[in-house]
C-alpha cells in the first residue's frame, strides 16, 4: 500500500485549512470514549452502542486481529447494516489494517476476484441472510485461493476452519503507530473495463470529506442519521462509522429497506438527516404521506447516486416543510464533489449543487475534480494512467455544465455504467459472462430510464438460434455463474444486428436512444 501522493501546494493547503490533520480516526474514537463515554453513537434495533462500548469492543477485536494477521493487512467485511460492522471497521483501523467493505449482494464470481485482487487476510461474513449461506460461499471461494483469508462468521455458525465472531478474544494489544496519510480503506467500484477497481482512501481523505459535510449540512452534535444505504458504499460507511465519532452524531442502522419502517425509525429516533438515491426519497415521501406525517425532526435529505428528478426534489421539499432537500454529486473516487444547494431551493432542485472543498472543472464537456477528499489512487497504479489528467484532476467520465457559473448540472455519462437504485453496474462485466451463453452471439447491455430504479439494465442480443433467450434464461445463467442479482438485466430484446461504427465499435448511445424511443 502507499501513502498519499499529492501536489505539495495542495497538501500544504489541506493541512493549513484543518481538513487534513495529524490525528487518525482511532485517535478520535479514543478521545470520544474518554470525553463522552456514554454518548450514543449507534442504534441497531434493540442494540445501542455508546462511545466507551464501541471503543472497548473495537480495541479488543484489534488485538485479536493482530494475533492472527500482520498490521497493514487487508480486512474485509461483507455484512448487512449491523452494529458488528462498526466494531470491525474501528478495530481494523486501530490495528493499522486496511479495511475493505464488500457489498453483501455480491456472489462467488465478484467475491473471488476481490479477495484475490486485494490479498485479503481476514474477512467477516454473516451466517445465513435472506436465504443465502455466506459461510458456505466463503468455503467455496477460499478453497481456490493460494492464500485464503481467515474467515469469521457473524451471527451464524462457522463451518470447518472458520471462526465465530463472538468467540474471538477481546484482549487489547499494542497497536502500531498510524500514519494519517497512509491507505486505510479500499472500496471496489465497477469500472468500464469490466474489472472492478480498488479505490484507495487515507485517514485524511476521509477526514476532509467529513469536515466538509459537517460545515454545510446543518450537522450538530446530537444529530441523528438514518442509514439504510449499504455500509459497503462510501456514503453508508461515513454516516455509520465516521460521523458518529468525528461529528458527534448518532447512526440509526437499517439492515433491510422498508419505507414504512424507515418512517417509523425516523420518527422514533428523531432522525435529523438521511441520504440516499432517488428510490429512497421517492419511497420515504410516499410512506410519510401514508402515515400522515411530515417528519418534523428531519432537517436534511441528501439525494444522489442516480438521476434525480427536479420535480421530486420540489415535491419532497414542499411536503417536508422543515427539511432541506437537495441533490448532490460525487463518486467513490471524489466523494461529495458537490455539497448541493442547501441555501437555494430552486438550485437544490434543478442542479446538482455547487462544489465544496473540491476543485471542479469541465474539459470538453467532461467533469473533472480534485481536492483533499480525492482518492490516493487505485490499488493497481496502472489504472491511474487514464484516470487523472496532467494537472491531477480525476476524470470522472461524467458530462455536465455550469449554471450561473457556480452550480453543476450532470447531464450524462461518458463512462459505460448503469446506475440502478444507486448501485453502479458495469455492463462489460455482465456482457463478458453472458457471451458464454450458447444462444448469444453478440450482446450489448445499456441503461434505460426507469421511474422506480433510476435506470434498468436492458440486454440487446443478436442470436443465430431464434427466438433467443428471455429474461428468465439470462437470470438462470447468471445465477449459475455466481453473478450478483442486482446486476441481472431486467429487460431483453433481440435484434438482427447491433449498430456499430466503421471500426466495429458498438454504438451504445444509438441503442439507448432506440430503446428510449420504443418506451415512449
Label the model's feature ranges.
Residues 22-23, 37-38, 170-188, 195, ...:
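Conserved pre-ATP/AMP-binding loop-to-beta segment of ANL
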Residues 63, 106-113, 123-125, 274, ...:
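AMP-binding/adenylate-forming catalytic core of the ANL superfamily
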Residues 50-52, 184-208:
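Conserved AMP-binding A3 loop
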Residues 7-8, 129-180:
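ANL superfamily adenylate-forming
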Residues 268-275, 285-347:
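Gly/Ser/Thr-rich phosphate-binding loop
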Residues 354-357, 364-391, 425:
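Conserved ATP/PPi-binding loop(s) of AMP-dependent carboxylate-activating enzymes
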Residues 19-22, 26, 30, 38-68, ...:
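Conserved AMP-binding/adenylate-forming core of the ANL superfamily
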Residues 207-224, 232-273, 287:
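Conserved AMP-binding/adenylation subdomain of ANL enzymes
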Amino acid at each position: 500500500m502507499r501513502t498519499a501522493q499529492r501536489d505539495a501546494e495542495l497538501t500544504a493547503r489541506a493541512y493549513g485549512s484543518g481538513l487534513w490533520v495529524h490525528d487518525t480516526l482511532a485517535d478520535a474514537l479514543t478521545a470520544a470514549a474518554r470525553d463522552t463515554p456514554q454518548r450514543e453513537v449507534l442504534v441497531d434495533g434493540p442494540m445501542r452502542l455508546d462511545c466507551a462500548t464501541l471503543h472497548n469492543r473495537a480495541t479488543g477485536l484489534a488485538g485479536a486481529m493482530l494475533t492472527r494477521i500482520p498490521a497493514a493487512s487487508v480486512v474485509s467485511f461483507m455484512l448487512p447494516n449491523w452494529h458488528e460492522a462498526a466494531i470491525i471497521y474501528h478495530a481494523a483501523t486501530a490495528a493499522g489494517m486496511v479495511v475493505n467493505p464488500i457489498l453483501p449482494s455480491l456472489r462467488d464470481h465478484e467475491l473471488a476476484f476481490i479477495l484475490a485482487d486485494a490479498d485479503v487476510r481476514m474477512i467477516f461474513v454473516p451466517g445465513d441472510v435472506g436465504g443465502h449461506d455466506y459461510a458456505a460461499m466463503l468455503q467455496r471461494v477460499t478453497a481456490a485461493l493460494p492464500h485464503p483469508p481467515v474467515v469469521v462468521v457473524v451471527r451464524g455458525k462457522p463451518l470447518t476452519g472458520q471462526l465465530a465472531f463472538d468467540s474471538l478474544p477481546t484482549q487489547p494489544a499494542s497497536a502500531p503507530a498510524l500514519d494519517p496519510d497512509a491507505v486505510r480503506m479500499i472500496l471496489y467500484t465497477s469500472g468500464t473495463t469490466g474489472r472492478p477497481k480498488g479505490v484507495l482512501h487515507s485517514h485524511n481523505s476521509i477526514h476532509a470529506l467529513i469536515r466538509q459535510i459537517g460545515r454545510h449540512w446543518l450537522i450538530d452534535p446530537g444529530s441523528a442519521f438514518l442509514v439504510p444505504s449499504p455500509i459497503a458504499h462510501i456514503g453508508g460507511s461515513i454516516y455509520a462509522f465516521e460521523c458518529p465519532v468525528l461529528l458527534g452524531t448518532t447512526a440509526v442502522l437499517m439492515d433491510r429497506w422498508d419505507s414504512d419502517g424507515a418512517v417509523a425509525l425516523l420518527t422514533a429516533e428523531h432522525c435529523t438527516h438521511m441520504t440516499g438515491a432517488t428510490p429512497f426519497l421517492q419511497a420515504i415521501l410516499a410512506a410519510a404521506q401514508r402515515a400522515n406525517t411530515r417528519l418534523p425532526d428531519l432537517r436534511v435529505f441528501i439525494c444522489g447516486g442516480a438521476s434525480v428528478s427536479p420535480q421530486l426534489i420540489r415535491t419532497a421539499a414542499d411536503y417536508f416543510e422543515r427539511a432541506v432537500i437537495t441533490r448532490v454529486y460525487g463518486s467513490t473516487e471524489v466523494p461529495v464533489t458537490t455539497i448541493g444547494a442547501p441555501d437555494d431551493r430552486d438550485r437544490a432542485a434543478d442542479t446538482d449543487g455547487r462544489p465544496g472543498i473540491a476543485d471542479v472543472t469541465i474539459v470538453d464537456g467532461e467533469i473533472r475534480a480534485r481536492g483533499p477528499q480525492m482518492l490516493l489512487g487505485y490499488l493497481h497504479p496502472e489504472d491511474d494512467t487514464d484516470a487523472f489528467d496532467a494537472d491531477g484532476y480525476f476524470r470522472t467520465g461524467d458530462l455536465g455544465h455550469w449554471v450561473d457559473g457556480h452550480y453543476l448540472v450532470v447531464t450524462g455519462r461518458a463512462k459505460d455504467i448503469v446506475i440502478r437504485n444507486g448501485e453502479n453496474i458495469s455492463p462489460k462485466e455482465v456482457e463478458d459472462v453472458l457471451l458464454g451463453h450458447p444462444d448469444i452471439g453478440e450482446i450489448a447491455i445499456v441503461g434505460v430510464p426507469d421511474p422506480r430504479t433510476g435506470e434498468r439494465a436492458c440486454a440487446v442480443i443478436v442470436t443465430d438460434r431464434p427466438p433467443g433467450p428471455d429474461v428468465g434464461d439470462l437470470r438462470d445463467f447468471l445465477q449459475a455463474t455466481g453473478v450478483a442479482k442486482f446486476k441481472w438485466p431486467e429487460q431483453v430484446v433481440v435484434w438482427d444486428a447491433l449498430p456499430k461504427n466503421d471500426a466495429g465499435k458498438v454504438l451504445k448511445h444509438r441503442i439507448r436512444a432506440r430503446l428510449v424511443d420504443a418506451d415512449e
